Amino acid sequence: MEINNIIYSNPKQAVLPMLIQDYLDICDPVLTFDRFMGEIELEKYLKNIPQHDTGRLRYDPVSMLKTVLFGFMANGYISLRELEDQCKVNLRFMYLMDHQAPSYRTFGYFINEVLADSIEEIFQDINKKIFETEHVDLQHLYIDGSKFEANANKYSWVWKKATEKSRYRLFGKITTLFEEINEELLCTGMKLCINSEYAPEYLKEAAEQYAEVWQINEAMFVHGRGHRKTTQQRHYEKLKEYAAKLEEYVEKIKICGEDRNSYSKTDHSATFMRIKTDYMGNDQLLPAYNVQVGVADEYIAVVDVNQYRSDMDCFIPLMNKFYTTYGFYPKYPVADVGYGSYNNYIFCEQQGMEKYMKFPMLKKETTDKKYHEDPFRAVNFPIGEDGIMRCPNGKNFNLQYRKNVKGNKYGRQEEVYQCEDCSGCPYAEQCKKTDKNRTVRINRELTAMHQEVIENLESIQGALLRMNRSIQAEGTFGIMKNDRWYKRIVRRGIKSVLLEVFLVSIGHNLYKYHNKQKKVAAAA
């Protein structure tokens, strides 16, 4: 008889210590993170978790919160499946989760359902604790924006203007159809109202009335080759078709809203923008979000996600968000050329902020001496004692009218002046481009603001602030994209994208805080 001896043994014996933290260095980022988070009351963000009396015990929500935040601190951006894997193999994540390994679905539910409503409060409280510890100066705020490509198909655009044109063409088709139906219904006494525009509800009502008059039964309709549709069937089907198409156009225009001209079919919150990183090589517009940050002492003090293509429209919402968080406006908001506009300068004056935002022609004004001193520029025309502006040829420029500037919120007006007579002028080729008398537009208030901005930025303090902005604000996006590999939005929908950006910003600030604490410890 054959005897099989099976030896049940484990050559690897358990060893001491059993505590994970004994394997970690005292300056390990997870220990710095855990000590810092221990000073914040995390339970208040987790009060809305639904309670269940049956089923398995839930994971500790405080540990889940710490694990998620540390994942974004350590990786820059971390996916749900990476979180699950790290909890199984990484000592740091094991330490935070106490050897438990939730599934990616559990992490997804926790982030989307539990953190979604409290993530901004978490961001603010973590920031306030860091700023209090590090004595961060919030009076100097360095602002920058970057367009992040959305998680949407590249050729899924819907253009608002194209939709509006299609809708007006459809209005014409509806009018033609109504005229045909009215001729058909002369004997019945029924008549459809003809307008320049129509609502989908009116077309549905008209289809119901038309079906009632002719006793139309859709089950008796014929389709396909060899069948001839009756006039009533054709008219009824067109009414239904036009109503559905009109409803589609109304929905598309509603999704676009008043502030943007496009959206993506796969992510309605994404707007098509021109992105600097043109990896397609054809200057193609791509669905994206405009992410704005305000940086103070290398920390992200305020962050916002916008659907505007221009940075100019993002400045005021960002400053209002800063005020809501900290209770005051920064004294020195420093921004690049994309933020300098009349609206933003007036807003700074109203809120007691200095003007340190460049305007579009600043570089040409300050570096191109020929352009700055050009005698044929309207701002360089001399004004006599009688208050009349004159050109280099001595001709008077008379005020024609004042007009409101499009898109202005504060009633900005331009003064339009015209030369009294340009005929026979020896400087005509240098001064004007048409055969008519030269017309110029002047906004003296904006010109004075530009001069103030130039003086601010050309001062010693202005030069230091400009240098710091390029280091801190642009450097923040450089770290995000190139060091921590967060180059594209993962989630869809403005609310989910804002949640994602807050998590990335919290991770960035905790990462900065750990590095600074490590330098202090090394210096000591």
Please give the residue ranges for each predicted region.
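Short, charged, low-complexity loops and linkers
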Residues: 16-24, 47, 460, 464
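A ubiquitous short alpha-helical element
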Residues: 1-5, 51-55, 461-464
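Basic, short loop/linker segments at the boundary and entry of helix-turn-helix/winged-helix-like folds
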Residues: 26-66, 72
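Hydrophobic alpha-helical membrane-insertion signals
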Residues: 1-31
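Anion-binding and metal-coordination hotspots
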Residues: 7, 68, 76-89, 100-524
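Helical catalytic core of nucleic-acid polymerases
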Residues: 41-43, 53, 87-97, 104-106
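A general alpha-helix detector
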Residues: 19, 63-69, 106
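Short secondary-structure transition/capping motifs
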Residues: 22, 55-60, 72-76, 96, ...
